[in-house]
């Protein structure tokens, strides 16, 4: 993606071009402010500048860092008192004017750039050769529509909701660029959620139709391509120039299929199902389409649990994704995550503290929930015989961490260092746990060493998509229904990868397979575990209309004469109001545009 990003750095001329539509009272919708003005005619004869207009939309995708909005759920808390997600859980702290998960401005601005690009793409002289020009134009149209679909998904997830009359609304569904002559009071009207989903699906399906599944070089000397309603025979050099591996990282047909799976699962979920026009059967169909490209069940990566710790990451080229990863950011060598989230004894700030709630979600090694007597869970030895993923994803008392395999003591009576419970309000754990997932354990943060390693952020992982399919298929067809493979088949494979069960069997899974309701509970729990700390649970709880106010808990461990004493503790309340299944429209937008309707309760 290096070549892609370099084109976006042409300068303010490119970014200003897209915004030369004129900004009046709508400046905040279409940032940044104009610094340079070039007429559209300049763009028509300079493809790099046209590319930069669409490039601005790319730069508005999540920037490669994790949000860790998990600290606003029952999965984690933060020891940083200034953390926006920590503060949003307070009484009346999440408001329409103070919204850490607001995406309105960024996504609406991205769509404005996209619409501007689409309105002019056919006027750009991409190349003097007719075939090359048609190939470029079709690819760019597919990219733009795919990007518009993903930004619509982000908008609906964060701002779709019920109005005071109980009508499920989406966002303004604008398909044309706005300019100084636009009537914003008529444009700034929220379309129905269903209409927004129809447009999202249409855009993403168009991207699937016209884009290559992946950008890969071909070895065929000639190829026939169909572009803009005509067929062309092109050489290998021409094909690779327009659709080859140099463009890996840009929106592709595979990514479009994944967005369809993500968005339709959201729309079919309890919070949106009544007004989205989308069914679980549709969501299952879209998820299966992308999983089939990955080989179905056999495509589940056996090393997918710790994709972030791949020692060969440094050798990844820009055109490569590991087996677990469908779409990723560029890799970079740093220690940013480790500096923030390692325990303090190994020079970290310990910012994310997993909760006892999340720890309890990990089953026993035999696959049974620890609340089930068949798990043989021992409260006096709570970390023994547990799901192997617990030790991979969470640092609990006595575990090792870091390049030196330091033993981490999280006990409340730890007198040795700051790793103990509440030893230092700015660095120590508040729950008795530290986050381990996403962190490289081969980094030494000692200031005399300042070690670094390669990282990237997975924008979309296959594990998410397998879980998407399992959830949708269970709701549509039951645990063992479906075409080709079932929800049961997916969950069986995921739990086998985790190392759950005994004697080659998973008796708890077999129990759940007899009931859609029990399988639903299991699928949701597997999703919670597999995707923890990646920003999913905040949105999952809302689309499921699940409990948002479960108290975050921790574990205090002390030494007693009879051995270690484990005492559950209350750490933090969750004070979300009843309307918090849906996020608000920004307050200033409601003030600026009387035609905009706010979601109920905000």
Region roles according to the model:
Residues 2, 107-110, 194, 199-201, ...:
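Long, intrinsically disordered, low-complexity segments
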Residues 2-13:
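Bacterial N-terminal signal peptides that target proteins for export
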Residues 22-25:
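C-terminal motif of bacterial Sec signal peptides marking the signal peptidase cleavage site
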Residues 27-88, 106, 141, 160-173, ...:
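An aromatic- and glycine-enriched ligand-binding surface/loop that stacks and positions planar moieties
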Residues 46-52, 59, 84-161, 181-198, ...:
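Conserved, well-structured interaction surfaces
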Residues 215-245, 300-314, 416-418, 504-510:
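Surface-exposed intrinsically disordered loops and tails
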Residues 383, 388-494:
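C-terminal substrate/ligand-recognition segments
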